[in-house]
């Protein structure tokens, strides 16, 4: 999945995983994913919410959205300079979505 650069195609492929998660997860149990957003052509792309929507469309309920702040990322130094040159903010968080299969 990480080699798919088209976001819609990524979500379509991820949805196959979501359907299998729903199939194998026992009723009233939980599933969690950690996912971040991205940028395409300097524009913010809310990938986490695109994937979250696919979970909801496939029968899961969102129990929690925990925001994880990212510290000491290896590539931060490189992107700090790029963000100043290109006038965009760094993405410094990820979402830990906790879903529940309610039957």
Task: Go through each PLM region and give its residues.
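Class I S-adenosyl-L-methionine-dependent methyltransferase catalytic core
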Residues: 1-103
């Amino acid at each position: 999945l990480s080699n798919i650069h088209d976001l819609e195609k990524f979500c379509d492929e991820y949805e196959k995983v979501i359907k299998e998660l729903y199939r194998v997860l026992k009723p009233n149990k939980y599933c969690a994913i950690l996912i971040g957003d991205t940028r395409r052509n300097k524009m913010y792309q809310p990938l986490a919410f695109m994937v979250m929507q696919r979970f909801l469309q496939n029968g899961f309920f969102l129990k929690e959205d925990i925001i994880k702040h990212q510290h000491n990322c290896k590539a931060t130094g490189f992107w700090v300079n790029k963000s100043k040159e290109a006038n965009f903010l760094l993405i410094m968080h990820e979402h830990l979505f906790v879903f529940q299969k309610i039957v």
